[in-house]
């Protein structure tokens, strides 16, 4: 069974392990790659939890929540992807990365997790009380055909190409 779970301290080890499997890829930045585990637990996770609640946001940022995609059929604590949901957009995000960024664990790519996880992430976004836009905006690099396919599989359309 696939499910999304917010970043939290209880699952810190498997979350940290996930971040060590990939570095910046296809426009998704990994600020936690090679971060030591103690710093991840004591600083990174509490800060992400605050950001998800709109607390102590740097200027120009909007609340965003990190959701890990788990597949219980692969393993009880197996993270197969990460979906970063921005609760609403400012001008920068509207013209930039959009509402949802995501990455699938390198070991689990090509298995449909992107499509299924994005569907769950879209449902989460629509449930958020501060989501006010009429449409959900997503963006991917032109060279990232797999991500474009994931978006199209979830009812997306190509608005424009840069």
Task: Report the location of each language-model feature.
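GNAT-family acyltransferases
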Residues: 1-99
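Conserved acetyl-CoA-binding loop-helix of GNAT-fold acetyltransferases
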Residues: 101-104, 110-125, 148-153
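Amphipathic alpha-helical recognition patches that constitute DNA-binding helices
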Residues: 14, 99, 135-137, 146
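Short aromatic/hydrophobic contact patches that present stacked aromatics
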Residues: 3, 101, 137-139
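A short, internal acetyl-CoA/4′-phosphopantetheine-binding micro-motif in the GNAT/acyltransferase core
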Residues: 70, 87, 99-110, 141
């Amino acid at each position: 069974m696939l499910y999304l779970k917010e970043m939290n301290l209880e699952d810190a080890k498997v979350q940290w392990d996930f971040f060590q499997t990939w570095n910046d890829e296809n426009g998704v930045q990994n600020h936690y790659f090679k971060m030591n585990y103690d710093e991840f637990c004591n600083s990174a996770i509490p800060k992400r939890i605050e950001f998800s609640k709109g607390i102590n946001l740097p200027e120009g940022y909007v609340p965003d929540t990190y959701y890990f995609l788990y597949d219980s059929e692969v393993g009880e604590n197996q993270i197969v992807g990460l979906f970063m949901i921005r609760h609403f957009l400012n001008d920068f995000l509207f013209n930039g990365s959009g509402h949802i960024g995501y990455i699938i664990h390198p070991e689990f790519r090509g298995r449909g997790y992107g499509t299924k996880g994005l569907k769950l992430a879209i449902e989460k976004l629509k449930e958020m009380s501060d989501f006010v836009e009429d449409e959900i905006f997503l963006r991917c690099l032109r060279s990232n055909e797999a991500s474009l396919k994931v978006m199209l599989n979830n009812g997306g359309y190509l608005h424009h190409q840069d």
